[in-house]
Amino acid sequence: MENPIIACDVSKGKSHIQGFIGLSNPVGNPFVVRHLKSDLKLIKELAKSLEKQAHKKPKFVFEFTGIYHECIARYVQSLGLDLYAISPLESAKVRKSQIRVTKTDSKDCLNIATVYYTRCIRKFESDNNDIKSLSRRKRDIREEMVRQRGVYHRYLDLVWPCFDEYFDVDSKVCGIIVSTYKHPYVIKRRSVNMVVEILLNNGRFSKNRAFDIAYKIKDYASNCVSGVDEKSDYVNALISSYSKINSLKKEIEEINLELDNLLRKSPVYQLLKTVPGIGANLLIQMSAEIGDYTRFKTAKQFVAYIGLDPSILQSGTNDGEHYSITRKGNGILRSCLYLVINQMLTRKLDNQITRFYFKKKSSGLSHKVAAVASCRKLACCVFGMLKNGTSFETI
């Protein structure tokens, strides 16, 4: 008798479940469970029923889908069942291999079971690692900060026109003046000494430097023609966007402290530090996205995980022309490697990676194609470093 399994097609808030004792022996019809404790108890009942019939504990097999599987995976682990995750690409291959292609949630349970019984799949290991979650949260915050800065600059150009000709609008001086006075016309009514006092209390300026800035600000205020009056809601919007930027900066600082404590123990982080061209932010992102490198047995598996493996089509007399990369892997890690290559080229570093790039470039390839090929070579180098525990060495 084949191993019993519970096949699960996961979606947002609910999943389709079906039991199997062998591929040709489904137990009952697929049914829907919501991701609530009251519904998830049905999985426990199904597991007991399958164990009674097959005299073996069933395995729980599900389709890996972003974040929606996490709650159901934790519940099933609490039942003491082994979990196996399959890629949506694998179940899609099974579905497309059928003569009559049918895509329904209930039918997907059978496709998932087919993958389990006909292919070798790995046991699921929860990817709940703090480094990755913190790194991705930091990335989201940085993206939000870029958006918020755009909003801030737009309001600043309206309320404080031409201020960027006097000061760097992202500097501390600009922040102190805008948050304190809110509108340039307010400065007209303030003395130079009052402006100096504000600068000395809120920033690290010498007295002479503070007076220079104060005279410059007074000169700006006397020439400024604001697009709105002092009571306009745009002034409030400007201050609000400035406060949001400061709040996001503080959040990033807190995350950086947490990441610093966690990454000190990470061998991946320590080895990647030796690769030239990897800055602080890229270093954190790459360490987080690689995670447990021991799950990759070969460099080819690591390259495929990043999505840098070439797609190949072979048919008849066509000997298998190599097309573009698959892009079916970890997009964040792929982007990081591409940025590292560009950084190496910008800094004019001389190593085996940049020489490989120029070799490809001299053969007629465009910058992008040569850079992507270099990313693949760098990925192989990184895998070798991690597997052997060696630092990057320029050859």
Region locations from a protein language model:
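A detector of single, family-specific signature residues
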Residues: 1-395
